[in-house]
Amino acid sequence: MKPLIIIVGPTAVGKTALGVALAQALQGEIISGDSVQVYRKLDIGSAKPTLAEQGNVPHYLLDALDPAEPFTVAQFQTLANQSIQNIQSRGKVPIVVGGTGLYIRSLIDPFQFAEHGSESIRSFWTAFLSEQGKEALHRELAKRDPLSAQRLHPNDTVRIIRALEMCQLTGKPFSEIRGNQDMNYPPLPPSLLYVGLTAPREIIYERINRRCEQMVAAGLIEETHNLIKEGYSPKLKPLQSIGYRHALLYLYGKVTLPEMMRIFQRDTRHFAKRQLTWFRRDPRVVWYDTYSGNLTNILESLIGTCSGMESRVE
């Protein structure tokens, strides 16, 4: 059986380029581990790889859903595992590339999700919020997960509902899943290589600032506007993700274009910091520094590692 490779790290660190290069070298196929790239029509703001950037490598879980369709960790876990099995059954190497920490965690340390879908759970807590108010919602979280309740302000109802949803789906406090408590990191199977990409903070932030500017220049605002014109609600989860929610602020006249750019870059930098914090908690990640021109060295190292893994697995 071919090994499974997982590539993680903060946004703008170079995961896509490495994943494609590695897939081309190893006859691999890529599974996206990104919670926004899974949606059709959300291309620029999600930094979805273009056909040229995909380099003729088959990609899975890109453009898989309509923006109005819900997508949960449980769904990702199921679809990604199906894709992994499909790829390995054909003698290819599955490579998961993404920065959505909970998605990746669900593949490495499979969570047992409740049989009922999370949409009904989310609907229940949304109705509870409407009827009882945000303070009561916050108290419900405090009963189930005191650490998350301490971390989240009562006004942050979206994240509170998310935490309550995960408590019910996994049977564990969301803070435990996030890593706020001592976590058990069991050894990885010999057929799995867990790769993390990083870079000095100033380089990551510089790349992020430049990428945000490039997204706006490439038509992020127009892409967002078109989605609204097509009838998609601005309250949809993917349209509340980084980039799209900032474009909406500008489109609705809440901020000027320079102010939109400032908070877009700031929030993306904060997001990258949270991503690094999440993945650095896991001692099983093998880290590589993606300083300029280092892709070739990382690629050669990973090809050698994978060759050794494949011989051991076989």
From Swiss-Prot:
Catalytic reaction annotation: adenosine(37) in tRNA + dimethylallyl diphosphate = N(6)-dimethylallyladenosine(37) in tRNA + diphosphate
Span list, region Interaction with substrate tRNA: 34-37
Top-level division of the source organism's lineage: Bacteria
Cofactor(s) required for function per UniProt: Mg(2+)
SUPFAM superfamilies noted in UniProt: P-loop containing nucleoside triphosphate hydrolases
Site feature: Interaction with substrate tRNA: 100, 122
Family, per entry: Belongs to the IPP transferase family.
Subunit record text: Monomer.
Identification of the protein by name: tRNA dimethylallyltransferase
Organism per entry: Desulfitobacterium hafniense (strain DSM 10664 / DCB-2)
